[in-house]
Amino acid sequence: MPKQFENVTAVAKANIYFDGRVISHTIIDSTGAKHTLGLIYPGEYHFGTAAAEIMELVAGACRVKLAGQTDWTDYAAGQTFNIPADSSFDIVITEGIVEYACSYV
C-alpha cells in the first residue's frame, strides 16, 4: 500500500465510531477504489465488514483476532492484515494511537 495517495477525491465528512475513539476519512483513488485513512485511540473494539479489507498500520501497535479464530495476532507499524468480506474482527490497541490506511478489495 502506498505511503501517499495521489490524485484522490477526499470525502470531508468523517466516519466517527465508538464516541470518537475511532475516526477515519474516505478517499477515492483515480481508479475508483475506496480507501480510508484513520486513527484508533487506545481501547478494545469490534468491527464488522461488508467488503474485504486490507489494513496497513502506519503508526502504533495492536492485537487482532479475526472472526472464527481463537488466537490474537500482534501487528505494528508497516505491517498489514486482511479481513474477509462479511466478517468481523476484534482489535486491541497496545501502543500509542494506531494510524492506519484501509483498502477495500
Can you name each region flagged by the protein language model?
Residues 1-33:
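A short, N-terminal "cap"/entry segment at the start of jelly-roll beta-barrel domains
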Residues 28-50, 80-85:
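Conserved short histidine dyad/triad with adjacent acidic residue
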Residues 46, 66-71, 92:
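A structural signal for the main folded, soluble domain(s) of proteins
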Residues 69-86:
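Short acidic-glycine-tyrosine-enriched beta hairpin
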Residues 49-64:
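Short, conserved beta-strand element in jelly-roll/cupin
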